[in-house]
């Protein structure tokens, strides 16, 4: 479970973290941007994974303290599912909290995609 159990704050933490990650990936993956008819090249070629890694690190350092920053539904759901099949003594998979790291990142990713499409 999270270090700080506040459903509303944890949901928005996951939403914001995923929003930032997806929005950054969209800009990194698109090596040029057209603004008022002028094409601006900013792609960095083979180093594209480096800024994504830095973005994930920054998200972890800023938003990771409260929830552990799933920022990907599979990162939480897969281990939680396996944990319920392979339980450990005196531990529970905490399904009452499981919707936050699933729904928060999905909403954040959709909002990032919508905003990117509006801006581009």
Language model regions located:
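Membrane-interface helix-loop junctions and terminal tails of multi-pass membrane proteins
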Residues: 1-120
